[in-house]
């Protein structure tokens, strides 16, 4: 396996997540968030010659990290199309799936992507820069009520209405284009002592809306349930409560949209067995080495 990579993204909860997959030598696995390839490399280390790994990523930058290995296939796509591409590759069942839902550190640190309030650049925030609305597009076109809903749902903010109103007023004067433009609008609404936390919530809400992240996560989980063989495992690393609640609920019930089945006693009839009833978090040592692992939570389930 060629281990060259254009950047050194540190994979979070690497051992814990791949251990959780219980990789079998000849199995078929999917890393739906390939990114820098860290988790994929570890899965390949544990796969035998007859096993295969599919790596999904919609970000064109991730293609620079593809390694040469006949056991690996890269799929340039959002993971919400998991079932479509597995069918295209004639894969009917998989033995395991891993997802690390965090935004790569290389993206946070790239001022041209607009993911972070720490770097001044254009407000883009798209994972796939070839299509879709940018963060600036949303701020300049969404109605005030739609902006309120976005900040309420995805940022869990208490002052969503005030922020949304200020955005609408500001864009009447001039178009919002850069991170600095946005920060200037937000300044009166961020309390001293909680600046970073509140800005992180606001930027999170905008990023989730730009990339339709929660909708994509739901779709991927539903498809993963259908693809996993009995005994196959799914390991998901989340970074905020919205994602974690979705994953926890899905592992418990196996559904989002359908009627949730219960037994005679009212217990959920889930297609999954929970492997770790307590979420797995990064050790103190890992947090020191990689501070962005601090908020990571790992949940693992096995298809019954």
UniProtKB/Swiss-Prot annotation:
rRNA processing in keyword set: yes
Disulphide bonds in the chain: none
List the keywords (alphabetical): Cytoplasm, Methyltransferase, rRNA processing, S-adenosyl-L-methionine, Transferase
GO CC, sorted alphabetically, is:
cytoplasm
**InterPro entries linked:** RsmH, SAM-dep_MeTrfase_MraW_recog, SAM-dependent_MTases_sf
Q: What is its EC number?
A: 2.1.1.199
What is a biological process (GO) this protein takes part in?
rRNA base methylation
Q: What class of enzyme is it?
A: transferase
The entry assigns this protein to a family as follows: Belongs to the methyltransferase superfamily. RsmH family.
Summarizing the function annotation, the protein's role is: Specifically methylates the N4 position of cytidine in position 1402 (C1402) of 16S rRNA.
Output this protein's name: Ribosomal RNA small subunit methyltransferase H
* Taxonomic lineage of the native organism: Bacteria, Pseudomonadati, Bacteroidota, Bacteroidia, Bacteroidales
